[in-house]
């Protein structure tokens, strides 16, 4: 199991999608956002490598 899969499984075990959305909504500030994620075949994974939201579109549809 790769590191991204492990991170996703840890998140999935502790929070459902609505809780993750609430957490991200509270932390995203548009262009200054530090929340990063990557879409994979198993879902969206928070990451320190990829920025999933363009600076003008940090919205739930962008994140997920």
UniProtKB/Swiss-Prot annotation:
Processing and modification events after translation: Contains LL-lanthionine, DL-lanthionine, and DL-beta-methyllanthionine, when coepressed in E.coli with the flavecin synthetase FlvM2.
Cross-link (Lanthionine (Ser-Cys)): 33-37, 47-53
Propeptide: 1-31
Cross-link (Beta-methyllanthionine (Thr-Cys)): 44-52, 55-58, 59-62
Keywords (A to Z) from UniProt: Secreted, Thioether bond
Record bears the keyword Magnesium: no
Cellular component terms (Gene Ontology): extracellular region
Predominant cellular place of this UniProt entry's protein: secreted
Location in or out of the cell: Secreted
Disulfide-linked positions: none
The keyword Transcription regulation is annotated on this UniProt entry: no
Signal peptide (residue range): none
Function in brief: Lanthionine-containing peptide that does probably not show antibacterial activity, since its analog [+2]Flvbeta.d does not show antibacterial activity against M.luteus. Also does not show antibiotic activity when tested with [Del2]Flvalpha.a, an analog of Flvalpha.a, which is encoded by the same operon than Flvbeta.d. The bactericidal activity of lantibiotics is based on depolarization of energized bacterial cytoplasmic membranes, initiated by the formation of aqueous transmembrane pores.
UniProt-recorded name of the protein: Lantipeptide Flvbeta.d
Organism field: Ruminococcus flavefaciens
Gene that encodes the chain: FlvA2.d
